[in-house]
């Protein structure tokens, strides 16, 4: 009986210690995550939104990366503490050029030598949640790998869903993606534009899994533009 009471007292003081010193007593040094969300955006739709300004004369003619987000099914992950000793700078010139093509900042003018602040911000907000499984550099390599392995524009074109004046149905877009990946994707369609496609993966990046939702797009026809209706100017 005395042993049981002693154990209960120990748990009580541990709980009190956690409450008083939560930041350094009970916190884990690394974030755990259940799955990856690869968020891809269609540039013409994204740059057509009323709240978006894209100062580029030419937009990419492919889906580009918005982000690679580690996440949990029980609670959302973001702004995880970076406990690594990595210097937050990409030194591989080939990787930088690859990111400039596949993960550009559409709200900034295109440059011959891309700045890295945009990608570092993505790491701090989302990528660090993938530690310790993925380092700073590995995180961007994985994002590019998943994006190249899942060509959404090609998936849609196989079902004759191509950018243009004709609208596309949400169910048709979902069906075309599931047909190839085997998983249920999430679509984002603000202002009636097919703007984002989110594909979910096991933490290793394989296989594709069903995204847990929510699924914000109603089953209404969406605009999938080949040319933006907004005017762009190179600043």
Swiss-Prot record:
Keyword Thylakoid: no
Disulfide bonds: 47-54, 80-129, 189-217, 200-211
GO cellular component term of the entry, any: extracellular region
KW Nuclease (keyword) present: yes
Alphabetic keyword roster: Disulfide bond, Endonuclease, Glycoprotein, Hydrolase, Lyase, Nuclease, Secreted, Signal
Binding site for RNA: 41, 66, 105-106, 108, 118, 125-126
PROSITE patterns: RNASE_T2_1, RNASE_T2_2
Entry's Gene Ontology BP terms: RNA catabolic process
Enzyme Commission number(s) of this protein: 4.6.1.19
Catalytic function, reaction form: a ribonucleotidyl-ribonucleotide-RNA + H2O = a 3'-end 3'-phospho-ribonucleotide-RNA + a 5'-end dephospho-ribonucleoside-RNA + H(+)
Enzyme active site: 66 (proton donor), 122, 126 (proton acceptor)
An example Gene Ontology molecular-function term: ribonuclease T2 activity
Signal peptide positions on this chain: 1-31
InterPro entries recorded: Ribonuclease_T2_eukaryotic, RNase_T2-like, RNase_T2-like_sf, RNase_T2_His_AS_1, RNase_T2_His_AS_2
Taxonomic superkingdom: Eukaryota
Described purpose of this protein according to its UniProt entry: Self-incompatibility (SI) is the inherited ability of a flowering plant to prevent self-fertilization by discriminating between self and non-self pollen during pollination. In many species, self-incompatibility is controlled by the single, multiallelic locus S.
Gene: S2
Protein name: Ribonuclease S-2
Family label: Belongs to the RNase T2 family.
